[in-house]
Every structure is written in structure tokens, then in C-alpha cells.
């Protein structure tokens, strides 16, 4: 099924598909990554928690997937993220006014090790409609705080 979807998307876009993020962050290790490798996917953005914030891979820089069963480092680059906006809102019940209190410590940890802060935001989050009112400002504040010129 995945091969069929990647092939179809490639035809529609007239280009190779090399990046992936699993919907709902559904990740079965190592099978999901092996399937992506078989489809020539080079980068995956699924590595993160759905129900909490933090560093699921204990690292904030991209790394190549190491297959423990085969004892091989693969060419699949994993790009871990530290937080998802839906986790703050739905799982942690954080409102927009308090969201930066949760996000800033993550960014501070990343800056300490000169890493890369990656977060996951959905496009409808930034529309400022009733259900997501205030979250666009959180996103803007997060980007500003994470900028290299901020300490």
C-alpha cells in the first residue's frame, strides 16, 4: 500500500518522493523505517512523541537510522522533533497563554548543545479560528525565541 501511495504521489507531483512523516506519528520500529528505505525515502520526520513533549530519540540533531537487527547504519536520515502543538493543547491541556512556558525550556536545552529545534505544527493551527485562537501567536513567539540571535 505504501509503495502504491508513494508512486502515485510521485506521478502527480512529477518528482521523486524522498521525505516522509507518518500520519498520527504511527511508527513501528524497525519495520516502518525498513519500508521507507525500500522505497528510497531518504528523510523521515516522524520521530517524536504524540502524547508528551520532549526528545523521543534523546537527541536534537538528525541522525541516520541504525538497524539493530542487521547491525547496519542506513542512509535514512531521522529528523527528531521535540514538540507538537496538538500535544500541548489536547494531551497536556495547555492554553496559548501558557504554551511558551513549556516550549522555552525545550529550546533552551537545544541551544545548550548547539542542536536543532524542530517542532510539528499543522497548517490549520495557524488559521486563528476559534478552536486554535491564539496559537498562531505562540508559533510566532516560538520562532522568535528559537532564532539564533536569542539567548
Regions found by a protein language model. Give the residues of each.
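C-terminal domain-boundary segment and adjacent tail
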Residues: 10, 97-151
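Generic recognition of short, well-ordered alpha-helical segments
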Residues: 4, 31-34, 130-137
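Active-site-adjacent pocket scaffolds in enzyme catalytic domains
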Residues: 1, 7-110
